Amino acid sequence: MRFSMLIGFNLLTALSSFCAAISANNSDNVEHEQEVAEAVAPPSINIEVKYDVVGKESENHDSFLEFYAEDTATLAYNVTNWEDTNITIFGVNGTIVTYPHGYPVADITGASIGPYEMEVNGTSKFGQDVTLNLPEGQYFLIPFLLASRFDEIVRIAAPPTLFEIVSPPISFFNPQFLSVQVIFLAIIGGVSYYYMKSKTNQRPSKKSATVKKVDESWLPETYKK
């Protein structure tokens, strides 16, 4: 009996040691993963980025801003520096992804701006034009600002904007619409012509009236021809 208890105690001790070793190993792995993540993560920066799409202001951020293909969206930025040191904004770029799946479909062409030297708690305002060369559909617009702090370059993401590319309204003078009108009028004219022609062919011809000779025997001589 004592021998069985001794074996059980030894097994429990071994299992406890094994679990402790696994726990310590997992803890080391978690710490290592955190260190790697911190090493590869982009540097954080305390910058507040707001912007409006000029001419498309909307109070509801969940609604889609409508554009036509090849339209240009003008972004008016308002950036505030909440860092405890000065920073410099020197560029803008970004990406466009599909909604709701988030597949990248276009890059916003990078452009140099400023540079804008922003003091602590300072604010800068500037603009950016984005040409929407996209097919019809729904998208996310995600702009990025490029800034420098000390000797490091940071990429600052701005809030995404929902927008939609819609088909343009058809103008009365649109060549495609005019061609449809011409074809429609030609069809009406052709049908009318053949209808009138068939009616004319079906109309019975009038027989020439025969001239009857009048009996003049009863007339006085003065009235006879």
Swiss-Prot record:
Residue ranges crossing the lipid bilayer per the database entry: 170-190
Biased composition (Basic and acidic residues): 212-225
Topology class, membrane: Single-pass type I membrane protein
Main subcellular location of this protein, as a coarse class: endoplasmic reticulum
Lumenal side: 25-169
Localization per Swiss-Prot or TrEMBL: Endoplasmic reticulum membrane
Positions of the UniProt region annotated as Disordered: 203-225
Signal peptide: 1-24
Entry keywords, A to Z: Endoplasmic reticulum, Membrane, Signal, Transmembrane, Transmembrane helix
Membrane topology (Cytoplasmic): 191-225
Disruption phenotype: Displays increased levels of spontaneous RAD52 foci in proliferating diploid cells.
Family: Belongs to the IRC22 family.
Function: Is probably involved in a pathway contributing to genomic integrity.
The name this protein goes by in its record: Increased recombination centers protein 22
Source organism per UniProt: Saccharomyces cerevisiae (strain ATCC 204508 / S288c) (Baker's yeast)
